[in-house]
Amino acid sequence: MKKLIVCLLAVLLILPAGASLAAKNQTSGNLTNKQVMQMTLQAREHFWNTMSGHNPKAKNSTCQTKTFEYRGLPSTYMCSEFSTKAKLTDYLAPVFTKDAIKKGFEKYNIMSYKGKMAVPVGDGDNLLGWDKATIKLISQKNNTRTYEFSVPALDGSVTAKRKITFVKEDNKWKINQLDAAI
């Protein structure tokens, strides 16, 4: 009986220490290279889905193929999963800071037109192999981390250098530029 009580006390003493360590890591400034790469690839996917006006993973999505001209730019309506500013913002918010989303809407002329979200028609994607990029932390201040990526071209011709800044917003790491991973 004494052994059982000793074991239970040991477990009770160890569990709170482990739980507090896990909680500390959740709110600490730590950001691993694996997390950085995963978030960067997710940001790239979210950016290109936004620019195409459609998320291929969305279920029951409906899209209009109608194009129109807005401020001299051929534009198209976004599919139903991005039909409102709130829906599109909710899609982008887990990956990008509020400031990145706001500035990205302005930079890329993402607009609400006749009550529906629309985006200028573009060429889409580039020839960089982001999944094969190497990462180097180049700046670390409080809740901000900047990484330099060396991204090989898919045709093997050149390696592009890109800098991506991560900011801790609402206790979660997010990317501070909508087009950071293009």
Spans of model-derived segments:
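Terminal targeting/leader modules
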Residues: 22, 146-155, 160-161, 176
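Positively charged n-region of N-terminal signal peptides that target proteins for export
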Residues: 1-4, 8
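Sec-dependent signal peptide cleavage junction
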Residues: 15-29
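Short acidic DE-rich linear segments
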Residues: 7, 23-27, 179-182
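Core segments of small alpha/beta cavity-forming domains
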Residues: 29-117
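Short beta-strand edge/turn micro-motifs at domain boundaries
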Residues: 159-182
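Bacterial N-terminal signal peptides
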Residues: 8-16
